[in-house]
């Protein structure tokens, strides 16, 4: 059994050497990029979604999120909303780098979460535009979601719902 394990290990080592020898990258370009220093500049921005408006300040800190004076998990108990809001930090590898202080008015939980995400992304973009903007733009975090509720029309029950039509 030990013989088989040794032969497998030697075969794996040979294949790794072959793969490394065929690489087109130079050792300098293949090396991981140096970690970016966290900027100690505060950022502020406004985000809107549906009827919700979020005003955000980002301050260098430990990653605490305060929404309307309450803890993040208390204000947004839904894990999906929590994930949606923290996505800009995850994409930029800045989790735990900034404290978020947010004031949100109007709308429901989903609209407020979307507004907060847009505001955080805009604030991160403001802090370090050269490094953050391409990543945030590619992920779609800087795009304002323009979908809003359609207005109710006269003569209809809702925006498009009409009463049942009778031919005779």
Swiss-Prot record:
GO terms (BP aspect): translation
An example Gene Ontology molecular-function term: RNA binding
Biased composition (Polar residues): 9-22
Domain of life: Bacteria
InterPro entries per record: Ribosomal_Su5_D2-typ_SF (IPR020568), Ribosomal_uS9 (IPR000754), Ribosomal_uS9_bac/plastid (IPR023035), Ribosomal_uS9_CS (IPR020574), Ribsml_uS5_D2-typ_fold_subgr (IPR014721)
GO cellular component: cytoplasm; small ribosomal subunit
One Pfam family of this chain: Ribosomal_S9
Biased composition (Low complexity): 23-37
Disulfide bonds: none
UniProt keywords, alphabetically: Ribonucleoprotein, Ribosomal protein
Family note: Belongs to the universal ribosomal protein uS9 family.
Annotated protein name in UniProt: Small ribosomal subunit protein uS9
Organismal lineage: Bacteria, Bacillati, Actinomycetota, Actinomycetes, Micrococcales
């Amino acid at each position: 059994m030990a013989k088989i394990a040794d032969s497998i290990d030697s075969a794996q080592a040979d294949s790794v050497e072959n793969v490394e020898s065929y690489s087109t990258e130079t050792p300098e370009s293949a090396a991981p990029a140096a970690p970016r220093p966290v900027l100690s500049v505060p950022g502020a921005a406004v985000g809107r979604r549906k009827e919700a408006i979020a005003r955000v300040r980002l301050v260098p800190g430990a990653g605490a999120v305060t929404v309307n004076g309450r803890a993040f998990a208390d204000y947004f108990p839904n894990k999906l909303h929590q994930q949606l809001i923290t996505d800009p930090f995850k994409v930029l590898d800045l989790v735990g780098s900034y404290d978020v202080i947010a004031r949100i008015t109007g709308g429901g939980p989903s609209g407020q979460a979307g507004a907060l995400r847009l505001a955080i992304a805009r604030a991160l973009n403001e802090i370090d535009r050269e490094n953050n903007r391409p990543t945030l733009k590619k992920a779609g975090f800087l795009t304002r979601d323009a979908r809003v509720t359609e207005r109710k029309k006269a003569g209809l029950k809702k925006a498009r719902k009409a009463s049942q039509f009778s031919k005779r």
